[in-house]
C-alpha cells in the first residue's frame, strides 16, 4: 500500500519539497498534507528522504527515523581529512599474525556504508586465513601467468619478470605473504557489482589503519579472476552457439 510507506508529521512538515527533489527514484510528490509516495515498490530504501528533511518530519517504513543514528562527533577539518587520505599506502610486507575476527568485522562493517548504485548493496565477502589456501591461490595465479606467457599475450614480458621472482627466487609478489585474503563479491547479474565492490573495499582499506591493520589490493589475483571469468563466459557462449 503506497499510503503505508511514508508517515508525515504535519505539525513539523514545512512542505519545502526537498524530499521530493532528492528522491533518486522520483516516486515522491508534494500533496496538500506533505510528501506522498506514488509507487512504493520503486523505493530503494536509501533513506535520503528521511535524512534530508530539515525538521525530522518524515518517516519511511524501510528506513525508520527511530533507527537512525546521528553523527555526534565533530567532522575532521579539511586539513585533517586531506592528510588522512594522502597518507594512504599499500602494505607489501605483512606481519605473520592474521587479523582477529573482531578486526575483520569492524573493517567490513565500515565497508557496508560505501555508496552502491541504486543502493543495491548486496556485497559478499570471503575471508581466507589458511596459509595453505592462500599459497594455493597464489600458485594458481602463477599457473595462469605461465599460460599467458606461453600464449604470447601482451602481458608476456611483465609476467615473465613476476614468475622469475615467484618461481625462482621464492618471492611471493602475488599474495605478498599476507596472512589473510579478503574477496569482495557481488552477484553476477548486478551490472554495477564490480564498481560496488571497489567502492566498498576503498572504505574498508581507508579504515584499516585506524585499527592497526595494513592492506593492499592483490592486483594479480584480481586480474586472474577477471580473465578466468571472461574465458568461462566466452566458452559458454561458444558451447551455446554450436550445440
Where in this protein do the model-derived segments appear?
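Conserved small/polar residues in nucleotide/adenosyl-binding loops
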Residues: 231-238
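Glycine/small-residue-rich phosphate/adenosyl-binding loop
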Residues: 127-197
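Non-catalytic interaction/regulatory modules that flank or connect domains
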Residues: 110-114, 123
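Small-aliphatic-rich amphipathic alpha-helix that forms the alpha element of a beta-alpha
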Residues: 14, 107, 111, 182, ...
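Short microdomains enriched in Cys/His and/or Lys/Arg
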Residues: 37-52, 68-86
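Short, Lys/Arg-enriched N-terminal segments with co-localized hydrophobic residues
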Residues: 1-3
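Iron-sulfur cluster-binding cysteine motifs and their immediate structural context
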Residues: 5, 18-34, 48-65
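Specificity-determining recognition surfaces
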Residues: 21, 70-106, 239, 243
Amino acid at each position: 500500500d503506497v499510503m503505508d510507506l511514508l508517515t508525515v508529521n504535519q505539525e513539523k512538515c514545512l512542505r519545502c519539497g526537498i524530499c521530493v527533489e532528492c528522491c533518486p527514484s522520483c516516486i515522491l510528490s508534494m500533496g496538500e498534507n506533505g510528501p506522498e509516495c506514488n509507487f512504493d515498490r520503486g523505493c530503494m530504501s536509501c533513506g535520503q528522504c528521511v535524512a534530508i528533511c530539515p525538521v525530522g518530519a518524515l518517516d519511511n517504513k524501510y528506513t525508520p527515523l527511530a533507527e537512525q543514528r546521528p553523527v555526534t562527533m565533530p567532522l575532521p577539518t579539511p586539513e585533517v581529512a586531506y592528510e588522512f587520505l594522502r597518507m594512504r599506502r599499500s602494505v607489501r610486507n605483512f606481519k605473520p599474525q592474521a587479523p582477529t575476527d573482531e578486526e575483520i568485522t569492524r573493517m567490513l562493517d565500515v565497508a557496508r556504508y560505501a555508496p552502491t548504485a541504486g543502493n543495491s548493496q548486496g556485497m559478499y565477502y570471503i575471508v581466507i586465513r589458511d596459509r595453505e589456501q592462500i599459497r594455493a591461490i597464489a600458485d594458481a595465479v602463477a599457473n595462469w601467468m605461465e599460460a599467458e606467457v606461453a600464449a604470447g599475450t601482451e602481458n608476456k614480458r611483465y609476467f615473465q619478470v613476476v614468475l622469475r621472482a615467484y618461481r625462482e627466487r621464492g618471492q611471493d609478489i602475488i599474495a605478498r605473504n599476507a596472512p589473510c585474503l579478503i574477496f569482495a563479491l557481488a552477484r553476477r547479474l548486478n551490472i554495477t557489482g564490480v564498481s560496488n565492490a571497489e567502492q566498498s573495499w576503498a572504505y574498508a582499506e581507508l579504515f584499516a589503519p585506524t585499527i592497526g591493520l595494513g592492506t593492499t589490493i592483490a592486483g594479480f589475483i584480481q586480474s586472474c579472476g577477471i580473465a578466468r571469468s571472461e574465458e568461462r563466459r566466452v566458452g559458454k557462449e561458444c558451447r551455446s552457439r554450436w550445440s
